[in-house]
Regions:
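Extreme N-terminal starter segment of soluble prokaryotic enzymes
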Residues: 1-5
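Short beta-strand-to-loop capping motifs
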Residues: 8-10, 55-61, 97-100
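N-terminal structural module
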Residues: 9, 15, 24-25
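Hydrophobic pocket-lining residues within nucleotide cofactor-binding pockets
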Residues: 12, 38, 103
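Short, conserved charged micro-motifs
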Residues: 15-17, 61-67, 104-105
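Short, surface-exposed acidic-centric catalytic microdomains
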Residues: 20-63
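Flexible, gly/pro- and Lys/Arg-enriched active-site loops
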Residues: 43-50, 67, 72-175
Length: 175
């Protein structure tokens, strides 16, 4: 099964929405590796800070079907798609990498995501997938993060709260 790497973000009741999104991913896909959660300033507009994380899943879904499933999850969390592109979000989940695929499709599907140039995607992704390769840059996620101008910024780590016994609130159960 392919591995998909996801970027998760929220700045409206973010702890609840991210926790519930991670739970939904685990319910649908089983084991999910999740990065720590970090606080980042909004990009592209003046808004509340976002909480962002990355997740890795093994999926039986095509990129198009996975994108549709993620949109349904966002919608279930009250995602409003009628506003400007850069705006507050209850939940924003994007497929940033899907194995070594390069693709575009309906529903704003772009793999790899252009947002891979931003710290809010690269930092958490480098934590869980340092060796994953950007299919267009021919560099690893770790290399891209080390070269990023915000690499040395100390972004605040945020805990999502209670988790099942034997797990961390923001990490998958031990293997």
């Amino acid at each position: 099964m392919p591995t998909a790497y996801l970027s998760l973000g929220s700045n409206l009741d973010p702890v609840r929405h991210l926790r519930e999104a991670i739970d939904a991913l685990r319910e649908r896909f089983g084991e999910v590796e999740v990065s720590a959660v970090y606080r980042f300033p909004a990009v592209g507009y003046a808004g509340a800070d976002f909480l962002n994380a990355a997740a890795a899943i093994r999926t039986d879904l095509s990129p198009e079907a996975l994108n549709a499933w993620l949109h349904a999850l966002e919608d279930a969390h009250g995602r409003d798609r009628s506003g400007p592109r850069y705006s507050d979000r209850t939940l924003d989940i994007d497929i940033v990498l899907y194995d070594d695929l390069v693709a575009e499709g309906a529903g704003n599907l772009r793999i790899p995501r252009d947002e891979l140039r931003h710290a809010f995607v690269l930092k958490p992704l480098a934590e869980i997938a340092p060796g994953a390769m950007h299919p267009l840059e021919s560099r690893s996620i770790a290399e891209l993060w080390r070269a990023h101008p915000e690499h040395d910024v100390a972004f605040e780590q945020v805990e999502l709260g209670s988790a099942p016994p034997g797990t961390s609130p923001t990490r998958a159960p031990a293997r």
